[in-house]
């Protein structure tokens, strides 16, 4: 009888050990081994938006640093970053290659509204995470229709509504001229702006002009806006065209109050080419620390950023805020992968990406926290207004929440 009891105890213990081992069993999706996590993205390393290519390079640099420190739970991050020339058909081709040939676990930070729109249905049908896309289009936060797609930065509509409210409070009689890219990116900004102005939009907006990404310049559009009598200019353009618009408006003597979308606020990539003296007074929003701001010269996060750039991306421009943006997103992904533990399946990647609670990324502005949930796919919803003083962006006002 006692022997029987002893055998029952032993069998129970063995069963418990076995079930524990099963519980701790590693679960891997495509692209994952005991030593590697393979992910992919496309970036415009060539073409009209090539200024954004540095984002991919800064993310690769950050992951190299993480890998040198031992990786994530012993696994190194292998980011395959391919050029799509800011051309959606090329994006589709490259993403299919990453998913079907390279067998990446997920896509990360693919850049561009049109580019991500072109691959969204494909990736969701394949149940491949389209994670932290490098675009602020509002549609990236729709977990009901697209549960495998998540944005990262503040939405374009939220941003443009902030500008609208600012004008209503400080310049309610403004005559506004708008220049925007003729695609979903530009139209998303414009929708938010008009929504923010409400019933005053029709009266306050006196001119709307567009440009195509393939255009050589936007000089003629700026002349048109000047001729409209606008005294306020909402500049919804990518870096190349933003610099042209700032420079042209100054050179022809048109000096409106200028609102500049956040995707073109890089001092190195936009304002220096335009002319720093021609950029004084520009207003935008910020959410990452600006490496050109002397306020952060002793900030540990900015010092760490500069050290990473020096060691892992020495050819990169440390004054380009696109680089500190890239590293900020990379830090967010590292947290997601840490939360995944040894369950590195596509399903768990999305589960953990949608389970970020008051995450503090040191390179974000003080007070900004990243929060997501299964019903909230908008990680960053706090921003602050900023104004360019000829040398750097200066924050003003309080943190604004969506």
Regions from the PLM with identified roles:
Residues 249-325, 399-401:
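Extracellular/periplasmic periplasmic-binding protein-like sensory domains
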Residues 23-40, 68-77, 168-175, 343:
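Immediate post-signal peptide segment of exported/extracytoplasmic ligand-binding proteins
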Residues 89-93, 100, 138-141, 147-253, ...:
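Extracellular/periplasmic Venus flytrap/periplasmic-binding protein
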Residues 311, 315-324, 334-393:
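Segments of small-molecule ligand-sensing domains
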Residues 27-60, 82-89, 111-112, 179-188, ...:
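Extracytoplasmic "Venus flytrap"
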Residues 84, 131, 138-141, 213-214, ...:
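Venus flytrap/periplasmic-binding-protein-like
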């Amino acid at each position: 009888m006692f022997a029987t009891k002893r055998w029952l105890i032993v069998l129970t213990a063995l069963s418990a050990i076995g079930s524990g081992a099963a519980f701790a069993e590693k679960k891997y999706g495509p692209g994952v081994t005991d030593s590697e996590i393979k992910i992919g993205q496309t970036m415009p390393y060539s073409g009209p938006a090539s200024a954004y290519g540095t984002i991919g390079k800064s993310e690769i640099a950050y992951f190299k640093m993480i890998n040198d420190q031992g990786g994530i739970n012993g696994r190194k991050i292998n980011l395959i970053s391919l050029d799509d020339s800011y051309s959606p058909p090329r994006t589709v081709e490259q993403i299919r290659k990453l998913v079907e040939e390279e067998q990446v676990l997920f896509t990360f930070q693919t850049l561009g509204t049109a580019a991500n729109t072109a691959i969204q249905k494909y990736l969701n049908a394949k149940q491949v995470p389209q994670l932290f896309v490098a675009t602020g289009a509002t549609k990236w936060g729709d977990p009901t229709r697209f549960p495998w797609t998540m944005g990262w930065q503040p939405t374009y509509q939220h941003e443009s509504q902030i500008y609208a409210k600012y004008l209503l409070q400080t310049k309610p009689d403004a005559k506004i001229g708008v220049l925007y890219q003729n695609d979903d990116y530009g139209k998303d900004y414009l929708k938010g702006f008009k929504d923010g102005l409400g019933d005053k939009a029709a009266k306050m907006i006196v001119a709307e002009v567009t440009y195509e990404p393939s255009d050589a310049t936007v000089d003629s559009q700026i002349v048109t806006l000047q001729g409209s009598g606008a005294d306020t200019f909402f500049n919804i353009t990518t870096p190349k065209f933003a610099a042209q618009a700032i420079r042209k408006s100054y050179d022809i003597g048109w000096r409106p109050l200028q609102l500049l979308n956040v995707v073109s606020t890089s001092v190195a990539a936009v304002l220096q080419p335009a002319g720093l003296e021609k950029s004084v007074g520009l207003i935008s929003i910020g959410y990452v620390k600006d490496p050109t701001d002397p306020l952060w010269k002793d900030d540990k996060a900015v010092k760490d950023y500069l050290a990473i750039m020096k060691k892992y991306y020495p050819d990169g421009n440390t004054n380009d805020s696109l680089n500190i943006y890239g590293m900020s997103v990379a830090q967010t992904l590292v947290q997601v992968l840490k939360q995944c533990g040894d369950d590195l399946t596509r399903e768990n990647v999305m589960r953990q990406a949608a389970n970020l609670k008051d995450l503090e990324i040191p390179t974000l502005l003080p007070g900004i926290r990243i929060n997501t949930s299964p019903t909230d796919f908008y990680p960053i919803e706090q921003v602050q207004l900023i104004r360019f003083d000829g040398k750097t962006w200066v924050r003003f006002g309080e943190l604004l929440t969506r």
